[in-house]
Regions:
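Structural preference for solvent-exposed beta-strand-turn elements
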Residues: 1-210
């Protein structure tokens, strides 16, 4: 028999569907797909100031997005929602203007028009990620997102699965470099805005595209 879904009894909150969809699209990809690490398969929804903070990590990537003014939880409260359920929420949001969220003790329900998505919350403590986020940034890179995506895709063609892409940053310049032994070398230079000392860092290209 199909399981019966109880009507949510907690108070409901109405949010901007566009703001929630935008935040979820940025955060959900960082959640883990490994069911052996159940806590990391969830997205934390937490009270942050007068708004809502979305956080996900698979221990390699960390994504944090604040939705200002989207008050859902009381100060200090947080819940952990399965990322798979939130993927369905993203699909259901479509062009909707509003979404109603009900957070119970064990369940979360999203109402979008005539669609209702209900999921069990994940029990457990989400990792303390705050120490990983610096309070100040010594270096700041500003780059056109679409141009960066296309450049990473081109350079990635030369990178094997385990080969990272180097990002070499200097004044108003970014060079993407991939070197694979016995295969070859690929690089591409972009005009950007960079503030700070020269810096070279390396990323898994798939994570960078996410």
């Amino acid at each position: 028999e199909y399981p019966q879904i109880a009507e949510p009894t907690a108070d409901s909150v109405t949010l901007s569907a566009a703001a929630l969809a935008d935040g979820l699209r940025q955060v959900v990809p960082a959640a883990s797909n490994d069911d052996n690490r159940l806590i990391l398969t969830g997205v934390q929804l937490a009270a942050e100031g007068d708004g809502l903070r979305l956080v996900a990590t698979d221990s390699y990537r960390l994504a944090v997005r604040d939705l200002g003014g989207q008050s859902v939880l009381e100060e200090g409260q947080s819940v952990l929602v399965p990322s798979r359920a939130l993927t369905e929420v993203i699909r259901s949001l479509g062009d909707a203007e509003e979404v109603t969220l009900v957070l119970g003790a064990q369940d979360a329900t999203f109402r979008i028009g005539g669609v209702r998505v209900t999921t069990r919350l994940i029990s457990g403590d989400f990792p303390n990620y705050r120490g990983l986020i610096p309070e100040t940034q010594a270096n700041t890179l500003t780059v056109d997102r679409h141009a960066l995506i296309e450049a990473v895709r081109r350079v990635k063609l030369m990178a094997r699965e385990s080969t990272p892409i180097r990002l070499e940053m200097s004044h108003n310049s970014l060079e993407l470099v991939a070197v694979t032994q016995d295969v070859g070398h690929a690089s591409e230079r972009m005009d950007v805005t960079f503030e700070g000392e020269g810096l070279t860092i390396a990323f898994n290209p798939d994570y960078l595209l996410d």
